[in-house]
Amino acid sequence: MPVLDATPGQPLPLVAVITPYFEESLDLLWQCHRSVLAQDYPCLHVLVADGQPQAAVANWQVDHVVLPQAHGDIGSTPRLIGSFHAIGLGVEAVAFLDADNWLHPCHISTLMRARARSGAAFLSSGRMLCRLDGSVMGPCPLIDPERFIDTNCMLFAKEAFHLLHHWVLMPDYGHLIGDRIMLHHVRESGILCQHVNEASVYYRCGKPGLYRQMGEEPPAGIPARPDYEASFQRWLADGNAPL
């Protein structure tokens, strides 16, 4: 695995990609990071350790933010802290990438071109569903800019930065459906949104339902489906609009 030296003094990229991580292997982190390095639009990669830092990451071309303990919120807190770190440095947009996923080289440039054309403050893409070994199953049929955008497919431009705090201020039961809650706040805010159909995010499937959605049997040992319904019900019980 190559070791990259950080290059202080270089111009700050306009876009940051924020990756929270917890106990993912160094190999997965490297695949994730390598895909950010390969973007054809310059990006700052911010890796945020949620209480379990990998020492080797400090030698990569990243901003490595280490939190002293884990937050147990499926990456929401490190996602927000990484975003605010990058915004404080002066970036004009933040995107998200989970530690076990990776990007097509044109992902960021495609979204930023869509922003330039439309003036949108929130951009989104499709995603490609992949098996645990990284092989591709096909485009995700669930992505719908009106109802569901995966976190990895989201880009917030500066006009949408005021919405990012919802990663942490959502109710504790909400982190399981955090991407739907964030899309709810985006749509409620009235900011201009633009969706790009290209499936430029590679999403490693760790949930049985996605395999069945694609007509495959889930691999042995994969965790049981989380209880999303309980979170949706509590969201409604709290007086919120359906997601």
Where are these regions (language model features)?
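Short beta-strand-to-loop acidic/aromatic patch adjacent to the donor-nucleotide binding site
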Residues: 91-102
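Acidic donor-binding loop at a coil-to-helix junction in glycosyltransferase catalytic cores
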Residues: 173-182
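Catalytic beta-strand/loop signature of glycosyltransferases that borders the donor
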Residues: 124-126, 193-200
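Short beta-strand-to-loop element that shapes/binds the nucleotide-sugar donor at the catalytic cleft/hinge
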Residues: 123-136
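N-proximal low-complexity "stem/linker" segments adjacent to membrane-targeting elements
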Residues: 1-34
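Acidic donor-binding/catalytic loop of UDP-sugar-dependent glycosyltransferases
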Residues: 101-113
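Short, acidic, metal-binding catalytic loop of nucleotide-sugar glycosyltransferases
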Residues: 31-43
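Glycine-rich, basic loop-to-helix element that forms the pyrophosphate-binding segment
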Residues: 69-86
